[in-house]
Amino acid sequence: PEPEPEPEPEEDVIVINVHGMGSDRFSGNRLFNSLEQNGLVFGDMAIYHRHSDLSGAGKVLFSVANMVSPGHFQVPEGEEFSTPGISFFLPLPCYGDAEHNFKLMLQTAQMVSSELGGNVLDEKRDMLTPNKIDEYKQRVKVFCRK
């Protein structure tokens, strides 16, 4: 008999990390300004979210958390706050077009990284390579077929 095909996952989370160069840390106000200029809104769970509507209304497409546990941001502390990095995450299945949401999250992570002088890393905190991006795209496609 033929082996049973692997069941497709019911859910997944695509993670892209943005980390400071070496031991550099991202400072609060500079980080928060970059996230906000790139369409993210501070909200639920004290983290940033990209909504379907740029005004901050509508469904959440993806979110950004502090890389350091417990993951939230201390926005009121502004300049006193710093972190070695941030984590962008796209839960699957998601609202809307998963491929579009992934592309938007990747572009946003690259923009924030460029503005802050950081590195874009994968979920294991290794450099994000074109092969890894392709792997992420394949994982996203599984949910586009459902």
Label the predicted regions.
Residues G20-G22, V68, L92-C94:
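Beta-strand elements of well-folded, non-transmembrane domains
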Residues S27, L31, D44, G56, ...:
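Helical mechanochemical/support elements of P-loop NTPase systems and associated helical scaffolds
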Residues S23-V41:
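Amphipathic alpha-helical segments
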Residues V13-H19, F88:
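Active-site-flanking beta-strand signature of metal-NTP-handling nucleotidyl enzymes
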Residues S87-K146:
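Well-ordered alpha/beta subsegment
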